Curated annotation (Swiss-Prot):
<feature type="region of interest" description="Disordered">
    <location>
        <begin position="382"/>
        <end position="457"/>
    </location>
</feature>
<feature type="compositionally biased region" description="Polar residues">
    <location>
        <begin position="421"/>
        <end position="437"/>
    </location>
</feature>
<dbReference type="InterPro" id="IPR010929">
    <property type="entry name" value="PDR_CDR_ABC"/>
</dbReference>
<dbReference type="Pfam" id="PF01061">
    <property type="entry name" value="ABC2_membrane"/>
</dbReference>
<dbReference type="Pfam" id="PF19055">
    <property type="entry name" value="ABC2_membrane_7"/>
</dbReference>
<feature type="compositionally biased region" description="Basic and acidic residues">
    <location>
        <begin position="21"/>
        <end position="37"/>
    </location>
</feature>
<feature type="compositionally biased region" description="Low complexity">
    <location>
        <begin position="1"/>
        <end position="20"/>
    </location>
</feature>
<feature type="compositionally biased region" description="Low complexity">
    <location>
        <begin position="438"/>
        <end position="448"/>
    </location>
</feature>
<dbReference type="InterPro" id="IPR050352">
    <property type="entry name" value="ABCG_transporters"/>
</dbReference>
<feature type="transmembrane region" description="Helical">
    <location>
        <begin position="674"/>
        <end position="694"/>
    </location>
</feature>
<comment type="similarity">
    <text>Belongs to the ABC transporter superfamily. ABCG family.</text>
</comment>
<dbReference type="GO" id="GO:0030587">
    <property type="term" value="P:sorocarp development"/>
</dbReference>
<dbReference type="GO" id="GO:0016887">
    <property type="term" value="F:ATP hydrolysis activity"/>
</dbReference>
<dbReference type="GO" id="GO:0016020">
    <property type="term" value="C:membrane"/>
</dbReference>
<feature type="compositionally biased region" description="Low complexity">
    <location>
        <begin position="69"/>
        <end position="96"/>
    </location>
</feature>
<dbReference type="InterPro" id="IPR003439">
    <property type="entry name" value="ABC_transporter-like_ATP-bd"/>
</dbReference>
<feature type="transmembrane region" description="Helical">
    <location>
        <begin position="610"/>
        <end position="630"/>
    </location>
</feature>
Length: 793
């Protein structure tokens, strides 16, 4: 482990340098590509690429369904073919350089154009002060067509419906409403779509104890068809590592984002997540906030990697909240959502023109993404309006109100939204700079000369203005064009395709791979096992010291029952709580993998249960061995080895039962906080009716049923039977009552506590049923959570 830590530290040291050097390389590549595109506007030809890994064999398809395609363009392309060929000859060197940097970019065959039409989605909500739920529409008539080889960005303020739309497009959310999706003009089928697309979640849910290469090898063997040889799968992994620039960290632990387990950087984690989806060669890749939580340079590097994937012929669809301008420039098409409606759809570089035409202007130095989100974020409209007076008063005090009577325009100009020339503002950003004022006036004059209409004063769109903008889009040029394109796709431009059904790994392969991952995880974290082992030894020694070498006197009766209760609680409570804190992270990874169809629920559940069972057997055995001999559990003449093994068996069953309960609780509750609050209450409640604190004969009538469902009752009853059956106790003359010892036989102790002396093996099988029952319920909960079928209308 020390050597592993040293390697991790070394990788940590150069990961930043690696990220920076690769970042500079990406910038240089983008400059070369921009130079090439300016000199040669026609797209490069893509040769056929037989991707055996994804098991999909598409027929020849026409990916060039474009919003701007028409017969005139086709004729112009034919007339200019010779000129383009000359340009191609002049730029051969540039093309060769680009191909060397990305061999796969012009060899992707399975290109898919993705379209969606009239997506309407409703959710059930409860209004304040009312119990009845009402239906609220959160997506309204959303349309779009995404060409292969492009990046399609979905933007909008929080609550606009971005993630909901992406989940619907990815078939991860049932449509509660209507809508149709098309793949190359064919109505989307869930099974086909699952084979053609990859989905990258916002969070990087990865096993921290595996290296990057081990992670990709694991998913390659599970995601790729079973008939693909292992050698080809491993080669595919190496190709992806090369393509995504992960060579330097390939043998470094993934680690955790909070550095509890040190590993790769955030940008590398994001690229690993994307790489997992690339293993099967998907034609469509959907990403939820791919730059979330990353710094500026890392975000640019990740988006540059996605741009390369798009240039190779893949269709990239992503939601993104507020990208920097250099990232926004990478988008080919943009869907801007506001309150679940389409505010703009079309070319990303044409969005500003659209808003300019509607009277909303963005200054040249402002990031378009900031402008769009500031403009349509009506959720903070009321707060913004209420602060206007205070804002203007403050600016007059600081800026002196110089330059005009308007007063409040400086703050608006600072966020990049130009206002009416009649509303001259004060100093920009509270700085009295004459040069900036002159530039502002020149900009306003230029805008006035190019647009005769008076500019609206905008900080945020009012609700009325938002309604107007929503109504304007469907009748706009962009809205009419996309509707016409979708009609043509759904009626005329169908491109039939076939795919070969392939089989993934069988049950045994899935189980062995998942179990191997669990074993590796345990080996990479020996400290966790060591801590649990020390805890087990400490509990045994503590109990053994306190109850050391108990005799058979009258006072030992109480002490022997105390040993039983103490040690059962000692192994049970930690088993529950440790699972509550660990299992949620495992469930997160499972749900992500299950949604992608990586493996089935049963092999995952069995592999996890088997590994937990092994640990839950060893530790109680250690505790039981120490306690049994130190406390002198059996000293009667009928002593044999059988009571010792029965004692060990009871502690193992107690640990397994509570471990299974902890797994059930942690899989059922929404988070760790709820689990840590619920688990102790359940344990205490069931332990209260175990027969140790209250005699089972004294339980109130209306609660008489509760001891029968308390698993602690069966644990303690079996342990008491094992400790007291056929044991003879002694007493001194002073302790005798009427010449007789108060307690002579252990069998009497068992009966006085309300237990049955013949129920030991019955209780053993009841506890086995509890373990199975808790595990089956856990399996059903996981199965229910992982079910996510798409309802096609």
């Amino acid at each position: 482990m020390d050597s592993n830590n040293n390697n991790n530290n070394e990788n940590e040291a150069f990961s930043g340098a690696s990220e920076s050097s690769e970042f500079r390389k990406i910038v240089e590549e983008n400059e070369n590509e921009r130079e090439f595109e300016q000199s040669n506007p026609s797209p490069p030809e893509y040769s056929n690429y037989e991707n055996k890994d994804d098991g999909i064999n598409l027929e020849t398809i026409n990916p060039n369904i474009s919003l701007d395609n028409n017969n005139n363009n086709n004729q112009n392309n034919q007339n200019n073919q010779n000129n383009n060929n000359n340009n191609n000859n002049q730029n051969n060197n540039i093309i060769n350089n680009l191909n060397k940097k990305n061999k796969k970019r012009s060899t992707f065959k399975n290109r898919i154009d993705f379209s969606f039409k009239d997506i309407n989605h409703y959710v059930q909500i409860t209004e304040k002060g009312k119990k009845k739920k009402i239906s609220k529409q959160i997506l309204t008539n959303i349309n779009g067509h995404i060409e292969s080889g492009t990046i399609f960005a979905i933007m909008g303020p929080s609550g606009a419906g971005k993630t909901t739309l992406l989940d619907i497009l990815a078939h991860r959310l049932n449509i509660n409403g209507s809508g149709t999706m098309y793949l190359n003009g064919n109505k989307s089928d869930f099974n086909i779509f699952k084979k053609l697309c990859g989905y990258v979640t916002q969070s990087d849910s990865l096993m921290p104890s595996l290296t990057v290469r081990e992670t990709l090898n694991f998913y390659a063997q599970l995601k790729m068809p079973r008939d693909v040889p292992l050698k080809e799968k491993l080669q595919r992994v190496q190709d992806i590592i090369d393509e995504m620039g992960l060579n330097r960290c390939a043998d470094t632990l993934v680690g955790t984002a909070d550095n509890k387990i040190r590993g790769i950087s955030g940008g590398e984690r994001r690229r690993v997540t994307i790489s997992i989806e690339l293993l099967t060669g998907p034609s469509v890749i959907l990403l939820d906030e791919p730059t979330s939580g990353l710094d500026a340079s890392t975000s640019f590097y990740v988006m540059s990697a996605l741009k390369k994937l798009a240039k190779s012929g893949r269709t990239i669809i992503c939601t993104i909240h507020q990208p920097r301008s250099n990232i926004y420039d990478m988008f080919d098409n943009l869907l801007l959502l506001g309150d679940g409606n389409t505010i703009y759809y079309g070319k990303a570089n044409k969005a500003l023109e659209y808003f300019n035409a509607n009277g909303y202007h963005c200054s040249e130095k402002t990031n378009p993404a900031d402008f769009f989100l500031d403009l349509i974020n009506t959720q903070v409209e009321d707060q913004a309006d209420s602060d206007d007076d205070d804002y203007n008063d403050e600016e007059e005090e600081i800026g002196g109100g110089g330059g005009g009577s308007g007063g409040g325009a400086g703050g608006i100009e600072d966020i990049g939204i130009s206002i009416s020339p009649t509303m001259n503002g004060s100093a920009v950003d509270n700085i009295k700079n004459n040069e900036l004022k002159q530039q502002q006036q020149q900009q306003q004059q230029q805008q006035q000369s190019t647009d005769g209409r008076a500019r609206r004063r905008i900080k945020k769109l009012t609700k009325e203005e938002m309604v107007i903008l929503k109504k304007e889009y469907p009748n706009s040029e962009q809205g009419l064009r996309v509707n016409e394109t979708l009609d043509n796709i759904s009626k005329e431009n169908r491109t039939d395709f076939k795919y070969e059904k392939t089989r993934g790994p069988n049950f045994l392969t899935q189980f062995s791979l998942l179990l191997g991952r669990e074993v590796t995880n345990a080996k990479r974290h020996p400290m966790a096992f060591k801590v649990n082992l020390i805890q087990a030894i400490f509990q045994g020694l503590l109990c053994g010291i306190v109850y050391y070498q108990l005799g058979l006197g009258q006072s030992s009766v109480q002490s022997r029952t105390g040993v039983v209760a103490f040690i059962i609680m000692g192994v049970s409570f930690p088993a529950v709580m440790s699972t509550i804190h660990v299992f949620p992270d495992v469930i997160t990874i499972f749900l992500k993998d299950r949604a992608s169809g990586v493996y089935d629920t049963l092999p995952f559940f069995l592999a996890k249960s088997f590994m937990d069972a092994c640990i839950a057997v060893l530790l109680p055995m250690v505790t039981a061995t120490i306690v049994y001999w130190m406390t002198n559990q059996r000293v009667d003449p009928f002593y044999s080895a059988a009571p010792f093994f029965r004692f060990v068996l009871m502690l193992v069953l107690a640990s397994q039962t509570c471990l299974s309960l902890g797994v059930l609780i942690s899989s059922s509750v929404p988070n760790v906080q709820v689990g840590t609050a619920v688990a102790p209450l359940i344990v205490i409640l069931f332990f209260l009716f175990s027969g140790f604190f209250i005699n089972l004969n004294d339980v109130p009538g209306w609660l008489v049923w509760f001891p029968y469902i308390s698993f602690f009752r069966y644990m303690i009853e079996a342990a008491v039977i094992n400790a007291f059956k056929d044991v003879h106790f002694t007493c001194t003359d002073s302790q005798k009552i009427g010449g007789v010892c108060p307690v002579q036989y252990g069998n009497n102790v068992i009966e006085n506590m309300g237990y049955d002396i013949d129920h030991f093996w019955r209780n053993v099988w009841i506890l086995v049923l509890y373990i199975i029952g808790f595990r089956v319920l856990t399996f059903l909960v996981l199965k229910l959570k992982s079910r996510n079928k798409f309802k096609q209308e």
